[in-house]
Amino acid sequence: MTSQRSLPADDFGIYYVLAECTDYYDTLPVKEADGSQPCSQGVTGLRNLGNTCYMNAILQCLCSISPLVEYFLSGKYITALQNDCSEVATAFAYLMTDMWLGDSDCVSPEIFRSALGNLYPAFTKKTQQDAQEFLIYVLNELHEALKKYHYPRRRSHEKGSAQRCCRKWITTETSVITQLFEGQLNYSIVCLKCEKCTYKNEVFTVLSLPIPSEYECSLQDCLQCFFQQDTLTWNNQIHCSFCETKQETAVRAGISKAPKIIIFHLKRFDIQGTTKRKLRTDIHYPLTNLDLTPYICPIFRKYPKYNLCAVVNHFGDLDGGHYTAFCKNSFTQAWYSFDDTRVSEIPDTSVQNATAYLLFYSCQPFSIPIQKH
């Protein structure tokens, strides 16, 4: 009789169960360490299918997020699949399998691109696309394919309109995507005439941050700019339900639910009418201990500090350019540069650079998946 080995629960509530993969995955060849590297799983290049560097960079970042990869490698996604929209999620699972358990230095994302292109034809064209927009489409489609319905119960003991508003469930649909990436902003809106305050919730998977300087600033500067109080006047006035007319208002945002993995979009592309330009500001961002305490509502400060786990870089201008990715591997704990099929290990000091476009931060360090011996 064989004994069942218990698996440790990780900080995300998802088991690291690479050792318990299905028989199909067991038949796939696994990359062997060459002696100089502890392991090369998850360090695989992606072929460029014609201006698809934006897609490759995003896929490498998602491939570096262990709890997401484990969810697909374990086969858990199969039981959650919605039959009418399973093609993208299934193609994503096969691609993650090739990138983690295959024996090739690089693989082709053609099947995944084709599946997503059936829904969004723009991604099948050999033209450059925006990596942030592509990321949002991918996360949305994975959520739609894997969502389950949840019916929340009322909390009768809560007092205060702000607290009640913050504690409402974000959505009745949950998935591995919402569990990992979805956060919630809470806006306090004060009418400057009657001084009454109302609250509004807004979910997010990516936070788009303004860049307050043209030359140099920090990620904290971008966060402070995003979360500072804003006064809406003239054409931007908001309807006040108490005054029953549009009024000048003061609006301030806070994070009422911090996601386990928070993604920042640095708004480098400035488009005003027919004028387009790229902000080449050198933005300094920490690799560890990003403190979000000032921006999280006090009663929801469960994950105040974050560590960087992946970066999407953009070179060039708005009408062209090239995307690459920096990702931290959960096996080796080393950083790697992914430039389509070209993969190389880089020192921590190289992760900070002036071309960063998307930043992926995790509230907990990723655990090393259990390997089958």
UniProtKB/Swiss-Prot annotation:
Keywords: Cell cycle, Cytoplasm, Cytoskeleton, Hydrolase, Nucleus, Protease, Thiol protease, Ubl conjugation pathway. The keyword Transmembrane helix does not apply. Its EC number is 3.4.19.12. One of its GO terms (molecular function) is cysteine-type deubiquitinase activity. Residues 44-364 form the USP domain. GO terms for biological process: protein deubiquitination; proteolysis; regulation of cell cycle G2/M phase transition. It is found in: Cytoplasm; Cytoplasm, Cytoskeleton, Microtubule organizing center, Centrosome; Nucleus. Gene3D superfamilies: Cysteine proteinases. Belongs to the peptidase C19 family. The human ortholog is inactive. This is Ubiquitin carboxyl-terminal hydrolase 50. The gene is USP50.
